[in-house]
């Protein structure tokens, strides 16, 4: 009786072992993950370039540069007068 039960169990176990590992059903493919990462990097690069161009074209850098130049000139004049 034991032999009759052991043989089918052994056949099922051997078939499972010889079948190999089951493919992961929910695991994403590595190449698709890399493609998504590349797309994200390109999007981020485009947005960063757009922001930098917007900053370059705005008046803020020019005003800041002028303010620093004017302040530096005033400090320089005060140091010349005191010296």
Curated annotation (Swiss-Prot):
Signal peptide (UniProt feature, chain positions): 1-26
Record-linked Gene3D superfamilies: Apolipoprotein C-I
Principal subcellular localization: secreted
GO terms for MF: fatty acid binding; phospholipase inhibitor activity
Cellular component aspect of the GO annotation: high-density lipoprotein particle; very-low-density lipoprotein particle
Subcellular location: Secreted
Biological-process GO terms, alphabetical: lipid transport; lipoprotein metabolic process; negative regulation of cholesterol transport; negative regulation of lipid catabolic process; negative regulation of very-low-density lipoprotein particle clearance; triglyceride metabolic process; very-low-density lipoprotein particle clearance
Pfam families, per database record: ApoC-I
Alphabetical keyword list: Lipid transport, Secreted, Signal, Transport
The keyword Signal is annotated on this UniProt entry: yes
Matches recorded under PANTHER family: APOLIPOPROTEIN C-I
The family this protein is said to belong to: Belongs to the apolipoprotein C1 family.
Function according to Swiss-Prot or TrEMBL: Inhibitor of lipoprotein binding to the low density lipoprotein (LDL) receptor, LDL receptor-related protein, and very low density lipoprotein (VLDL) receptor. Associates with high density lipoproteins (HDL) and the triacylglycerol-rich lipoproteins in the plasma and makes up about 10% of the protein of the VLDL and 2% of that of HDL. Appears to interfere directly with fatty acid uptake and is also the major plasma inhibitor of cholesteryl ester transfer protein (CETP). Binds free fatty acids and reduces their intracellular esterification.
Record's protein name: Apolipoprotein C-I, basic form
Species: Colobus guereza
């Amino acid at each position: 009786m034991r032999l009759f039960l052991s043989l089918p169990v052994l056949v099922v176990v051997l078939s499972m072992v010889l079948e190999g590992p089951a493919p992961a059903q929910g695991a994403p493919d590595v190449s698709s993950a890399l493609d998504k990462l590349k797309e994200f990097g390109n999007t981020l690069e485009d947005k960063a370039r757009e922001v930098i161009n917007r900053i370059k074209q705005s008046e803020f850098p020019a005003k800041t540069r002028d303010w620093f130049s004017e302040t530096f000139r005033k400090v320089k004049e005060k140091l010349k007068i005191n010296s």
